[in-house]
């Protein structure tokens, strides 16, 4: 019988541990030398691809962080202490005056509206407005259905279709892109994709190639044949490291996309070769670890979309909220680049400016649609601007090159959070103009008046809740906000009149936190929300719950507002009074 080498047997566990260590180290490392504002080699738990390894690393990371936090009085003080003296000595409000000098004189490129629709959102300015006059207010009621095309699968298609050379191109609820005859609605071709195609949109270039993301890839397809453009990337595809679902833009020979890194990536339009990337986060050494936890750099994704000033070679980006929706204990500070409109100069590869609407967002007030490039008149001169309707009901009107607001706004001192470790911003912006197109914060007067019974029911339901202008969320106590404003559909702007049209919703919603009892969890609190409804299932605030609003962007005044959407049974009972129309 052969003899076993006892020393070798004893070494096997050591070898296994070493192999696991090496494999884990390999998983933690990521190499990408195309970022111009980020290190080529990063060492982070978020780089880990293997789910079992990621779970192990997170557990070790959280455990070590908790031990470090429990032993460090300095870190405890840093986490829990808020400078209330500084807060109390601050003024209640600060007026920020509108920019009046050195405005961006218009290059007249946005004076007219598009007469075609070769990109979701209408064009690269994303103004979603057509100058075609064949269909108008005098004959729209005479329209009849010419044809209907039914998808093979059910689901939502958020990105609107595009039109080119008598064909309609649209993504399906499944994983494919189709071309239809505009005249008959017959399918010409269907191209399967790896992921869900063109979730937020697609575009077609003058080279007759269609460009879109399927979350996993950037694709180029010939619009005539439906075949992949084999000269682009690898057989018509570019494998992406990070998810992409928004519509690309094209500037000269570059095609530009926004990813969930979050980042901007620039590729050669012909070959698909990567040129450079820009990381849309501001990482500082001061915020590597906070409260024993790794600083939460997640979120802030540009999922709302991007637009392009082709002549000036500038990409404009709208971003989402940082980290988790309703709590920010692991991400102190303003969370730069989140809840913002950002201007990125493609020639210099630098950020020209960024304008943040909500600081340290814990209410889910991200900017959900792409910025719109248009112009308004100031002091008799036409000025190029960037416009962004938001979930908070604001309309940001910013100078195209400086990013400064063209309307006054106030910074209002807001309540501090009572959640341990939650350091909310001392101030939030309140825009005086343009006038808000949706309800911005809940008040008692907003309680439903559909019936005395409904009023009583909702009053009882919210009696212990908090509400107000940017009132922070609490643990086990509900906070009321209006969930709605402008969603991912965004707005339309008539460039010839500087008029914006936006649909919005006003849904009263409970937000609250619950303490996480799970040992070594990365998150201290879980985030929760619930739409407030009466006993019959209707929203708990006064109707209308949705509006269509027209706003004059030159003076910031609302032209008109009409209810948009209905419950048919309430309409029949004449519950709607159209008091806001």
Question: At which residue positions do the language-model features occur?
Answer:
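Repeat-blade elements of multi-bladed beta-propeller folds
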Residues: 117-121, 156-176, 195-217, 242-264, ...
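Asp/Glu-centered strand-loop micro-motifs enriched in Gly/Pro and often flanked by an aromatic residue
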Residues: 122-124, 130-169, 187-193, 475-483
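Extracytoplasmic/lumenal domain signature
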Residues: 138-152, 177-197, 206-207, 218-242, ...
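Long, low-complexity segments enriched in small/aliphatic residues
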Residues: 428-507, 547
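N-terminal pre-domain segments of enzymes
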Residues: 31-133, 426-437, 445-448, 453-458
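Hydrophobic alpha-helical membrane-insertion segments, chiefly the h-region
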Residues: 19-29
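N-terminal Sec-pathway targeting helices
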Residues: 2-19
């Amino acid at each position: 019988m052969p003899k076993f080498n006892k020393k070798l047997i004893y070494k096997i566990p050591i070898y296994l541990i070493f192999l696991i260590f090496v494999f884990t180290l390999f998983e933690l490392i990521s190499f990408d030398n195309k970022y111009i504002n980020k290190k080529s080699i990063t060492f982070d738990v978020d780089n880990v691809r293997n789910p079992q390894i990621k779970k192990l690393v997170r557990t070790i990371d959280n455990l070590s962080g908790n031990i470090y936090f429990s032993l460090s009085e300095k870190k405890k003080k840093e986490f829990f202490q808020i400078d209330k003296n500084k807060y109390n000595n601050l003024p209640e409000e600060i007026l920020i005056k509108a920019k009046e000098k050195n405005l961006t004189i218009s290059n007249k490129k946005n004076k007219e509206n598009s007469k075609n629709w070769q990109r979701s959102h209408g064009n690269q300015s994303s103004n979603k407005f057509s100058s075609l006059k064949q269909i108008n207010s005098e004959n729209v009621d005479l329209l009849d259905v010419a044809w209907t095309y039914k998808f093979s699968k059910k689901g939502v298609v958020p990105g609107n279709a595009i039109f080119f050379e008598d064909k309609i191109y649209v993504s399906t609820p499944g994983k494919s892109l189709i071309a239809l005859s505009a005249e008959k609605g017959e399918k010409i071709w269907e191209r399967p994709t790896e992921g869900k195609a063109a979730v937020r949109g697609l575009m077609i270039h003058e080279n007759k190639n269609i460009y879109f993301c399927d979350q996993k890839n950037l694709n180029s397809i010939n619009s005539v044949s439906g075949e992949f453009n084999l000269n682009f990337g690898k057989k018509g595809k570019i494998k992406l490291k990070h998810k992409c679902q928004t519509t690309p833009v094209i500037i000269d020979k570059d095609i530009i996309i926004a990813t969930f890194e979050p980042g901007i990536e620039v590729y050669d339009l012909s070959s698909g070769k990567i040129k450079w990337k820009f990381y849309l986060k501001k990482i500082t050494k001061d915020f590597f670890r906070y409260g024993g936890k790794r600083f939460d750099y997640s979120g802030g994704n540009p999922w709302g979309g991007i637009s392009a000033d082709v002549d000036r070679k500038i990409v404009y980006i709208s971003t989402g909220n940082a980290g988790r929706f309703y709590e920010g204990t692991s991400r102190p500070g303003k969370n730069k680049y989140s809840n913002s409109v950002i201007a990125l100069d493609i020639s210099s590869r630098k950020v020209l400016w960024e304008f943040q609407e909500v600081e340290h967002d814990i209410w889910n007030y991200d900017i959900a649609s792409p910025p719109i490039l248009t112009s308004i008149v100031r002091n008799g001169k036409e000025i190029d601007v960037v416009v962004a309707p938001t979930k908070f009901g604001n309309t940001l009107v910013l100078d195209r090159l400086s990013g400064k607001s063209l309307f006054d706004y106030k910074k209002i001192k807001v309540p501090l959070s009572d959640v341990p470790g939650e350091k909310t911003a001392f101030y939030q912006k309140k825009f005086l103009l343009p006038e808000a197109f949706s309800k911005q914060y809940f008040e008692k007067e907003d309680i439903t008046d559909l019936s005395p019974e409904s009023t009583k029911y909702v009053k009882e339901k919210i009696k212990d809740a908090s509400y107000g202008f940017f009132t922070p969320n609490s643990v086990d106590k509900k906070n009321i906000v209006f969930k709605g404003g402008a969603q991912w559909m965004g707005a339309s702007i008539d460039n010839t009149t500087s008029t914006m049209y936006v649909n919005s919703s006003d849904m009263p919603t409970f937000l609250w936190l619950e303490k996480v009892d799970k040992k070594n969890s990365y998150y201290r609190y879980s985030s929760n929300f619930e739409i407030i409804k009466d006993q019959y299932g209707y929203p708990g605030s006064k109707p209308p719950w949705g509006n269509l609003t027209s706003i004059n962007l030159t003076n910031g005044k609302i032209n008109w507002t009409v209810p948009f959407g209905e419950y048919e049974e309430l309409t029949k009972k004449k519950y709607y009074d159209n008091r806001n129309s």
